[in-house]
Amino acid sequence: MNSRRRPVKKDSEALEISIPFDETPHLDPQIFYSLSPSRGNFEEPSEAASPTAALMNGVRAQLHLALERNSWLQKRIEDLEEERDFLRCQLDKFISSARLDADDHCRGKPGPRRAEGDGRGGTGGEASDPESAASSLSGASEEGSTVERKRQKQKGGPGRRRFGKPKARERQRVKDADGVLCRYKKILGTFQKLKSMSRAFEHHRVDRNTVALTTPIAELLIVAPEKLAEVGEFDPSKERLLEYSRRCFLALDEETLKKVQALKKSKLLLPITYRFKR
């Protein structure tokens, strides 16, 4: 050990003190460990932040899907409610027509009883007066024939009127674009008066889906007739009316669709959804 001795004088006495210069001081290594920053402390926030961002992205995606599904379900509910109202109107109309037929049938039943009563009166008068008996018998026979005719009419006539004519009206189909436009305008006028789509379709005896399938033709002719040149005229020998309606639907651009939606909100067009998809 290298050390230097320095004499120190105190009270006329010399003292020797040894001071080591070459020795390194002994320090506890735990002190340096406690002062040095930990790497894990800086890495933990980044690791914790990445799962949070992934979780937020997943929640946003699920929320977006839920909103789209909600809007789709809302449209579906509106369509089902309109179809329900239409079916209710059809059912009420059928019940009322059945009641009217039942009332007519009940009114026609007392006829034969009156005829039988007249016949009995005629037979009673026959014993007293032959001429009155003959006249009563002839009147009874005429009345019986009229009652029989009424029965035949009730059996055949009302049934044909109730089931035949409405079916014939329902089966009437338009054959060209002009017919589609004419029918659309009639239903639109009725809708503006009655304020109900179902009642308007019932009034004209037209199915809602049938009108929805041909609506693009009428809307194109009303809102953007200049686009008819792009679509072309309808030729029944080359395509069906449904295919022509689809081509008209594809010809409606974004600007035209915005005009159509604005007119539907103001009740200047039928607020009916399309049956085609792009």
From Swiss-Prot:
InterPro entries: CCDC106 (IPR031591). Keywords: Coiled coil, Nucleus, Phosphoprotein. A motif (Bipartite nuclear localization signal) lies at residues 151-164. It is found in: Nucleus. Residues 102-119 have a biased composition (Basic and acidic residues). Residues 61-99 form a coiled coil. PANTHER family: COILED-COIL DOMAIN-CONTAINING PROTEIN 106 (PTHR16477:SF2). Promotes the degradation of p53/TP53 protein and inhibits its transactivity. Interacts with p53/TP53. This is Coiled-coil domain-containing protein 106. The gene is CCDC106.
